[in-house]
Structures are given as structure tokens and as C-alpha cells.
């Protein structure tokens, strides 16, 4: 994760210096570099938190924030990878803004990890659907890809630390196997749920919930 992001930043910087990225587009790519730098700093803290979950529980900084804006910002990070694979995002977001209650830093990490997996395991020239919806004072966030899917005998194991299925080993040799473990522990720390629906050879959908902010009431 960190080596990929640093490499992406180096590529963008070289392309800005040699003129591959035109001047009028440089602000956009500088913002991506800054976003990634900040996210990696937060990831380091998340890994420390993960190590402490079993000892002291996880500390949450709860606030109201717009999950739709967070989704739109997070997908910008994956523009380069998506262009390489011919992937597109299909956003089905409820309302222009949708406020939830949660720890912004940690929820952003959930989104990054789920979208990163979707990009990684999607078939070329396919789409990734990200959806937000409201039911019974809960906001449901879904990330769905069209790709290799997860074998049935691996579904119950994907949340374990360092677990990687045989299919993912070939696709993601550099991954830590911590991503989904972090995701589940953060969701549970919020008192919420995350589920996975997957068919091998078809694709995977992750769905997690967050409390609807009273701002939406």
C-alpha cells in the first residue's frame, strides 16, 4: 500500500516536471499526492490502533460528516490504476450530501481498503458500483466489483489478519493481508455491521452500515 502510493506520487511528480501532465492539470495531481501523503500517515496510525484493539479497544473521534463527499474524494486516488485497467466508477449516491456519524479518519480507511480491493480484483474494462442508501436510520454503503470473486470456502476467513485466498495471492503479491481485518474491526468498533456477497468468477460486494446523522432528520 505505502510503496504503491509513494511510487504513484513519484510518477506524477516526474510527469509534472517533464510536461507530460499539463500545467492546467497540475493542481489536481498535486492534490492527489497530498491526499495520499495524508492518508498514509493516517494508515500508520490505524496499524498502531489495530495492534492495540485487543488490549485497550479502539478510540473513536465521532463527528458528523458527508459520506458522499468522502466517496467522491477517495475514488480520485485510483484514477491511474483505473485508467490502466479500463475501469470506471458507477456512483449511486443518495442525495447530493448524506451525513453520517463516525470517525472520519477510520471510515476513510474503510472506503480506501474496500475500493482498493475492488480495483485490484476487477476484470479489465468493467465498472465498480458504489452506492449509499438509507434504511431505518442507518446508512448502507456498498462497494461492488465485477471480477474474480471469493471462493465459498474462503468467505469466512477473509476477515482474519494476514489471510489471503489462493486467488488473491496471484493478484496481490505485495499486499499485507491486513486490509479486511482493519475494515471489520473499525466497523465493529462503531457498533455497526459489514457483510460480503461474492460469487467466484462473477464479483464481490461489501456492504457496511453507519448511523444516520441527526442533521439528516
Kindly label every feature range from the protein language model.
Residues 118-119:
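Short helix-loop "hinge" at the ATP-lid/N-box region of the Bergerat-fold HATPase_c
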Amino acid at each position: 500500500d505505502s510503496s504503491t502510493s509513494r511510487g504513484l506520487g513519484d510518477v506524477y511528480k516526474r510527469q509534472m516536471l517533464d510536461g507530460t501532465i499539463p500545467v492546467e492539470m497540475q493542481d489536481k495531481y498535486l492534490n492527489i499526492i497530498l491526499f495520499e501523503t495524508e492518508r498514509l500517515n493516517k494508515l500508520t496510525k490505524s496499524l498502531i490502533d489495530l495492534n492495540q484493539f485487543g488490549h485497550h479497544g479502539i478510540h473513536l473521534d465521532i463527528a458528523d460528516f458527508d459520506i458522499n463527499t468522502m466517496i467522491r474524494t477517495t475514488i480520485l486516488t485510483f484514477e491511474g490504476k483505473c485508467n490502466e485497467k479500463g475501469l470506471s466508477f458507477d456512483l449511486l449516491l443518495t442525495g447530493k450530501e448524506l451525513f453520517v456519524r463516525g470517525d472520519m479518519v477510520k471510515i476513510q480507511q474503510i472506503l480506501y481498503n474496500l475500493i482498493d480491493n475492488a480495483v485490484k480484483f476487477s476484470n479489465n474494462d468493467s465498472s465498480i458500483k458504489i452506492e449509499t442508501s438509507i434504511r431505518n436510520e442507518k446508512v448502507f454503503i456498498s462497494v461492488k466489483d465485477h471480477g474474480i470473486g471469493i471462493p465459498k470456502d474462503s468467505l469466512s476467513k477473509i476477515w482474519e489478519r494476514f489471510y489471503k485466498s489462493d486467488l488473491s495471492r496471484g493478484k496481490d503479491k505485495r499486499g499485507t493481508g491486513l486490509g479486511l481485518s482493519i475494515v471489520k474491526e473499525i466497523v465493529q468498533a462503531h457498533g455497526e455491521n459489514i457483510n460480503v456477497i461474492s460469487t467466484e468468477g462473477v464479483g464481490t460486494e461489501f456492504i457496511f452500515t453507519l448511523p444516520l446523522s441527526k442533521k439528516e432528520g
